[in-house]
Each structure stands twice: as C-alpha cells, then as structure tokens.
Regions:
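Mature extracytoplasmic/periplasmic domains
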Residues: 112, 284-295, 312, 327-408
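Hinge/lid segment of periplasmic solute-binding proteins
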Residues: 100-154, 181, 301-309
Length: 444
C-alpha cells in the first residue's frame, strides 16, 4: 500500500508537470506567433492623425511582443456600412475600430465592448468619459468608447480676401446679424460664395450656419430643448432665425456646386481654389488642411483666420459655441481577442498621446494633456484658436452630435430640410418650420 501511495504521488507530480509544460508551450507559442489585431479607422487622407495612430500601434506592439496591429484606413462613409454588415453577420469585423455619433445604434445593438474596466480613465477628461457613457444592451450604462477627438464648430475665413474686400473683423471676432449680412453681400458681389460648403457625401455640412444662429439667439439650454422636442419650432425666436438664414441663402451665400461637392472638395474650394470667403466647419479642419498641398492641404501662403459666429439681435447665447466629442475608438464586443484589443484602446489613455494629438493635429482631444509640454509646428494656429475662443462658453452639444439628442425620425427630417431643402432654395423658412413642428409633434 505504501508503494501504491508513492506511485500515485509520482503520477500526480508527473501529471502536473505535463499540464505545466502544456500551458508554457501554449504561452510560448502565442508569444512566438502572436495575434494580429485588426483596426479599422477613418482619416484615410489625414496624415497628421495617422501619425498619432501609428504611435499608439508602436507603443502597443512594444509592450506586447509577438502581437501586431494592422490598421486599415477608410473614409467613414464607406467604412460604417461595411462594419454594420460584418457585425450583423457575426464575422469579418475588426478588433478595434473608429466610432462616432454617426452610428449611435451600434451601442444598444451590443456591438461595442463595455470599457468600464481595462482603461486608465484617470487620463481621460471626465466629460469625455461621460459623453460615451450611455445605455447599452438592456439599458446597461457604461462607457463604450474613448473620445480621441474633440472638436468645436468654428467659422474660418480667408484673411487676404477679407482685406481685399475691405472687411474689418471686430476685435472679438463677432459680427452682428446685419453686419454679417453685409459681409456675405461683399463676398457674393466679388464673384465668390460666402460659404465653402459641400453636402454630397455628408449629412451635416449645411447645418453649421443655422445651428449656430439658433445658439446665438436662444442659448445652449434652449437649443437642447429644441432638438429634444421640448420647444416648439414655431417659437418666435426660432422663426426669426430661420427667416434671417433664408435671407442669406437668397443672397447666394452658398456655392452653386454645393450639392455635388464633397467634404474634401469643400476644403480645397476654400483654401486652394479660394472660391469662398468663409468656411463653417468643425475644428478638425486642421486634420485635412494642415498636410502638404499635394495631399490636399492648404497652400503655404494661405492666410487662415477665425471668426466667432454672428450674434442675432437680443441673443441669449453671447460667447457660446458648440463643442462635441467625435472621432473615437471602440472595441468589438464579439471579438476573439478582447483583452488585447482593450489594451490597444488603453494605450490612448496617456497624456503623452494627448500631447502628440494636440501638437500634430491642432485639434482638441478627450485625452488629458500637459499643455506646457505640447510641441507643435502649428503653434501659430493654436495661439489663434485660443485667442478667438478666450471668452467662449462651451456648450456640450455640436452640429454632428445633435443626432444623439434627436429621435432618429426627427434627425432625418432635420437633415432633409437643413442640409438639402432650405440651402438649395427648395423650401421656404416658414414651410421648413411647419415641417419641423409637424415632425416634432409626430415623433414626440
């Protein structure tokens, strides 16, 4: 019996040794061959943003030897339909991917991984974490993405063109509504459009001017009520804004090429072709325009200026401006490499990455930064941005994130009227408001 016990113990030790060897073999095999994580991203033609993503890839791979990351760049308009189809099919999707408010339905569908753990949230701005903390499957509240890009809705202008037209910008960068109408008139009379806006491949470019006019007139809190359906579109203040906006349209503020012009083309229309005085767009303008001219960037001698949006008479939104979190990173909930994919996302949660993003792109970020340590070749722009926005009261909603505050059906009506019908003179101001109010009551 004693020999039997010794033999049993020996076999148990041998068994554990075999198990240990197997585990080590699997670990060594994984380290040797590793995993190639797939990452799909927007920003196909934005080299400065790519530099940041490649730095994240480099840091992740250095920290996780044997594992690699392959980034495939798309234009988001092409990426999201493919991504939706892959998630619906349950195969063919990446481990990590670009995410933003264009596709809010991805969260309740369960396609994004819960980021409650695994991310160094202490290195992310609290407002950025709060922005993507939303109801998921079954109403579960969790953060679902890291807000890499934060962008405000700005109004850029051609300094040289303004000088040639005799337009003097007020010290605070704010024209009154009547002064702004004069500015628009001078641009049009000189043979160029007032606004370099192209709507052929995006659902929001023509929303900037009317949305900012509404903000200036009624203020951020009332705008939120309006987009949530809690305030009537027949409110006299809203009617005033729409009628004023239609006056600008009737003057010829938009280019006749607006409906056939893409977002990328509208950038070139502004800074290279110089066929428009102003460009209402988010502050990610720099991502497309601060690249070499041969890659679509603005000419080296182009004189870029920044305005604040005009103020309507008796406006309640003085110094207010929209800001929102946009280009973000999410992890596929159904991915086979969830832990490693989460580590890719976690690599973004670092002030050094925040500094790199701010310095290379000139765009705000949801990642915490150490401002004195930001090294940037576009410091002149960063200084101008802060000068123009020195008195700005930021409103945590933006033209592109109205979609998160509107019911889907209401958003469709909003886009069809403001991005298509009204700027193309297919519908009048009062008729537009009738349709918006009818939709508000129907989808309330």
């Amino acid at each position: 019996m004693h020999e039997d016990r010794k033999e049993g113990a020996m076999w148990r030790r041998t068994g554990w040794l075999v198990v240990t060897v197997c585990v080590l073999s699997v670990a060594l095999n994984s380290a040797a061959y590793g995993v190639d994580l797939k990452w799909w991203s927007h920003w196909a033609i934005e080299d400065n943003k790519k530099l940041v993503l490649f730095e994240v890839k480099k840091r992740f791979e250095a920290k996780h030897p044997g594992n690699t990351v392959t980034i495939t760049f798309y234009e988001k308009a092409n990426m999201f339909p493919v991504l939706r189809a892959a998630f619906t099919a349950g195969s063919g999707f990446p481990d990590v991917f670009y995410y933003e408010a264009d596709v809010p339905e991805f969260i309740p569908a369960g396609w994004l991984a819960d980021m409650s753990t695994g991310i160094r949230w202490e290195n992310i701005e609290p407002s950025a974490k709060a922005f993507w903390t939303r109801p998921g499957p079954g109403g579960k509240m969790a953060p679902w993405a890291i807000a890499v890009e934060s962008a405000s809705d700005e109004l850029y202008y051609n300094k040289k063109m303004f000088q040639q037209l005799g337009i003097t910008v007020p010290a605070n960068g704010v024209f009154t509504a009547e002064q702004f109408k004069d500015v628009v008139g001078k641009c049009i009379k000189s043979g160029v459009a007032a606004f370099a806006t192209g709507t052929s491949d995006r659902e929001y470019p023509a929303l900037y001017i009317p949305s900012e006019l509404l903000l200036g007139k009624i203020g951020g809190d009332e705008v939120k009520k309006l987009v949530r359906g809690e305030l009537s579109w027949k409110d006299p203040r809203v009617v005033e804004v729409f009628r004023y906006y239609r006056e600008l349209i009737d003057m010829g503020a938009y280019s006749k090429a607006m409906t056939s012009m893409t977002l990328a083309e509208s950038h070139r229309y502004f800074h290279t072709d110089q066929k428009a005085c102003m460009f209402p767009v988010s502050s990610w303008y720099t991502g497309r325009s601060f690249v070499p001219p041969e890659k679509g960037g603005q000419p080296k001698d182009f004189e870029l200026g920044m305005l604040n949006y005009p103020m309507m008479k008796d406006g309640k939104g003085a110094n207010q401006k929209y800001i929102g979190y946009q280009g973000s990173l999410a992890v596929a909930a159904m991915g086979p490499n969830l832990a490693l994919a989460m580590e890719v996302a976690n690599t973004f949660a670092d002030p050094e990455i925040g500094n790199l993003w701010a310095g290379k792109t000139g765009i705000q970020t949801g990642i915490k930064t150490d401002v004195p340590k930001i090294d940037s070749p576009i410091k002149w722009y960063i200084d101008m941005f802060h000068q123009v926005n020195r008195n700005t009261k930021w409103q945590d909603i933006a033209v592109q994130t109205f979609k998160l505050n509107m019911k889907p059906e209401m958003w469709e009506v909003w886009v069809s009227i403001l991005n298509q019908g009204l700027p193309n003179k297919l519908i009048g101001a009062d008729e537009a408001l009738d349709k918006l109010e009818a939709a508000r009551l129907k989808f309330k």
